[in-house]
Amino acid sequence: IVLRLASADCPDAFSRPDYVIPLTSWYYGKQKWPFRFDAETPPFFMRHATNDSGYGFALSVKEKLLEAGVPLDWKTVDDGGHGAFEITVDGYGHDWTVELVEWMRKNKILKTDNHEKEVD
């Protein structure tokens, strides 16, 4: 549903998200590519494990986003499957959250540091 709302086929501009953060993907289940991305598609922060069964679909999404000129921050990991980005997982399962905050600041999605406390 997120890809549908982010696509050019979104029923109205108010339903379209400002950004998209898919951490794993899955095959949509249709033979024909169901999404159209364009200049109005919001930026994507994508992470995927190469050993996830949905990796091929994620590569298709990546290719279509790049063809449409959509801003994309893409990284993969080799292990972890569909649960590679659970924050309870050691390693990159924790690290991607720092990258996400930096990406959100860079894209002016996260505008303040109010969540950080000053230390004396």
Which residues fall in each region the model found?
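Short, mixed-charge, low-aromatic patches
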Residues: 18-19, 55-63
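Proline-centered loop/turn at the N-terminus of a beta-strand
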Residues: 19, 42-43, 71
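Short, charged helix-to-loop "capping" segments that act as catalytic/coupling loops
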Residues: 9-16, 49-52, 89-91
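Short beta-strand/loop motif that positions the catalytic acidic residue
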Residues: 40, 45-48
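Primarily recognizes the serine-hydrolase "nucleophile elbow" in alpha/beta-hydrolase
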Residues: 1-39
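The conserved beta1-alpha1 loop
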Residues: 24, 48-49
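Acidic catalytic loop of the alpha/beta-hydrolase fold
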Residues: 28-29, 50-56
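C-terminal catalytic histidine-bearing segment of alpha/beta-hydrolase fold enzymes
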Residues: 47, 59-120
